[in-house]
A protein has these predicted regions:
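A general, composition-driven signal for non-globular sequence regions
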Residues: 3, 22-26, 141
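N-terminal secretory signal peptides that target proteins for export/translocation
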Residues: 1-8
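Low-complexity, intrinsically disordered segments with a bias for serine/threonine
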Residues: 8-9, 22, 30
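Core of compact, soluble alpha-helical bundle domains
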Residues: 27-153
Length: 153
């Protein structure tokens, strides 16, 4: 009789454990934190911010010297590189295939004042599209990591 009650307890525990696993498996998994890319709104949202940012840069007399002589095609390529870099850096599916920042900005003579003005334009573009403060801060923090390779003077 004793071995039968041990068997019953083992059987009951086994069934209970199986039932618990079945129930736990049917519960939704704890939501994983969304990437910055997802929180911003994905590719189209990033593209809108980048497009606005580029319009601001190209329209600013301070940046004329950097864009003078570039063809429309060249400007489109620069835009795509910026978009791909932001997309990849925010956790999106894009792959940045451009040159490293130091190489692509070498010889341009970008100053701290240029950097600060560009950062203000980017912040204004993020504000225009109502990117929340947390996400805006993360984008600007990423861009700040590039400063040492972009600013020459």
């Amino acid at each position: 009789m004793r071995s039968s009650s041990r068997f019953e307890r083992t059987l009951v525990l086994g069934v209970a454990f199986s039932l618990l696993l079945t129930i736990a498996g049917s519960l939704p998994a704890r939501a994983q934190e969304k990437t910055l890319y997802e929180r911003i709104g994905g590719y189209n949202a990033l593209a809108a911010v980048v497009d606005d940012f580029i319009v601001r840069l190209v329209s600013d007399k301070q940046f004329e010297k950097f864009f003078a002589g570039h063809s429309t095609d060249s400007k489109k390529r620069i835009r795509q590189h910026i978009l791909d870099q932001f997309c990849a850096a925010t956790g999106g599916p894009c792959v940045y295939t451009g040159r490293d920042m130091k190489t692509s900005h070498a010889g341009l003579g970008i100053t701290d004042a240029d950097w600060d003005a560009a950062a203000k334009h980017l912040a204004a573009s993020l504000d225009k599209f109502k990117v929340p403060e947390r996400e805006k801060g993360e984008v600007l923090a990423f861009v700040t990591t590039l400063k040492k390779d972009i600013v020459e003077k």
